[in-house]
Amino acid sequence: MYTVEFYENDRGVSELWDFLEELRIKSASNKDARIQYKQIVLYIQLLQDNGTRLSENVTKHLMDGIWELRPGNNRVFYFCWRGDRFVLLHQFRKRSQKTPRREIERAKADRDDWLARKGE
């Protein structure tokens, strides 16, 4: 079993947590939001239970220690920290075949910020 943490910027804000909370609220009356919310939560649970030992349609290594969870058209970036923890960084809705470079760069910047503040 692994520990999953949500990245928070230096002001204590987690965009991913806020996004999931918004989806959870919308899911009461919106079927698409309900499906997205359940998929993302399931994939986070799979990561927590199995680590990166999941099929590539669930998780994929991108580069430089940055991974992505792949629930539907959503992508949730994360990295492994201290061997038994995963830090969930941010998400975006994938609209093209290739993951946009700016999203990967943002994930790397968030990871570097986390490591600078929390330590290797």
Spans of features found by a protein language model:
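Short, surface-exposed beta-strand/loop micro-motifs that present aromatic residues
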Residues: 76-79
